Amino acid sequence: MGYKGKWNERNKNPYVNEKILKKIIKMNETGERKIIKVWDRSCTITQEMVGHTIAVYNGQKFIPVYIQPEMVGHKLGEFSLTRTFRGHPDKSAKVVKKK
């Protein structure tokens, strides 16, 4: 059988939210540039989205993401982190138990 996870993922069609794509195409025709709010983090970035700013919801607030050509094929959620890394704790802060 074998592992086919990556093979299947590459050969599937990308998921693009139709509402978002329609808004982007309409804005491309009119030449308008405004921020679009998006809750759909699993939406794949397409060529039509390049040059637009999309505000992606991370669970608390909307993070503005400017779409560049290198981002095509990635998901919107990759650029809007849901967790903040505050660093590792200091070694001096650890409490060492002695028996």
From Swiss-Prot:
InterPro entries in alphabetical order: Ribosomal_uS19, Ribosomal_uS19_bac-type, Ribosomal_uS19_CS, Ribosomal_uS19_SF
SUPFAM superfamilies the UniProt entry points to: Ribosomal protein S19
GO cellular component terms listed in the entry, alphabetical order: cytosolic small ribosomal subunit
Biological process according to GO: ribosomal small subunit assembly; translation
Cystine connections: none
Residues annotated as signal peptide: none
Keywords: Ribonucleoprotein, Ribosomal protein, RNA-binding, rRNA-binding
Record GO terms (molecular function): rRNA binding; structural constituent of ribosome
PROSITE patterns hit by this protein: RIBOSOMAL_S19 (PS00323)
Keyword Metal-binding belongs to the record: no
Pfam family, one: Ribosomal_S19
Keyword Transcription: no
NCBIfam families: rpsS_bact
Family, per entry: Belongs to the universal ribosomal protein uS19 family.
Protein purpose: Protein S19 forms a complex with S13 that binds strongly to the 16S ribosomal RNA.
Record PANTHER family: RIBOSOMAL PROTEIN S19P FAMILY MEMBER (PTHR11880), SMALL RIBOSOMAL SUBUNIT PROTEIN US19 (PTHR11880:SF2)
Annotated protein name in UniProt: Small ribosomal subunit protein uS19
Organism field: Sulfurihydrogenibium sp. (strain YO3AOP1)
